[in-house]
A protein has these predicted regions:
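Substrate-binding/active-site clefts of carbohydrate-active enzymes
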Residues: 1-166
């Protein structure tokens, strides 16, 4: 949920290997499964990002954690971890930089050192989601805004790249 392009190839967040090993080990595991007739489907998290590289000052409303459709404050400035520029990858495969424009909200205000759910000004939670907690679009981290054309374009580009790199049978 940090860098979708890093399959265990770049020194990022203190390690080159991911929880699946290096890129070579990951690709070998996929290939070995397929050699034995096992279809490989990757379980990819596309809802949110965690582990940002920098912060931005953003206007947001704090939401009721029991009902995310209810704001508990007016608009206030928060400091949110929303910049993802992947310095370890240095633009290889994609130079897209994720900023607050790419997200609906976060769960941490670094200014107040406060954990809560914050909806960015001018944004809304997705509608076609479970109604638990009023609206269960928000789960954790920086919630990706799928109404932004640049986000859709980047994730589409990544999906094609990922299928080409890994040769998996699909992903969800």
């Amino acid at each position: 949920v940090y860098d979708l392009y890093d399959l265990g190839e770049f020194d990022q967040k203190g390690s080159v290997a991911t929880k699946y090993g290096t890129k070579a080990e990951y690709l070998a595991a996929i290939h070995t499964c397929q050699e034995y007739g096992i279809d490989v489907y990757a379980d990819i998290v596309l809802n949110h990002k965690i582990g940002a590289d920098g912060t931005e000052i953003i206007n947001a409303e704090e939401c009721n954690t029991g009902n995310r459709e209810q704001e508990t404050t007016g608009i206030e400035q928060i400091t949110a971890w929303t910049i993802f520029n992947f310095p370890g990858r240095k633009g290889k495969y994609s130079d897209f930089v994720w900023t607050s424009k790419c997200f609906d909200g976060v769960d941490w205000d670094d200014k107040q050192k406060k954990n809560s759910i914050y909806l960015f000004e001018g944004k809304e939670w997705d509608k076609d989601v479970d109604s638990e907690n009023g609206n269960y679009d928000y789960l954790m981290g920086a919630d990706i805004d799928f109404s932004e054309p640049e986000v859709i374009a980047e994730l589409t580009k990544w999906g094609k790249w990922y299928l080409d790199q890994t040769q998996v049978d699909g992903f969800r």
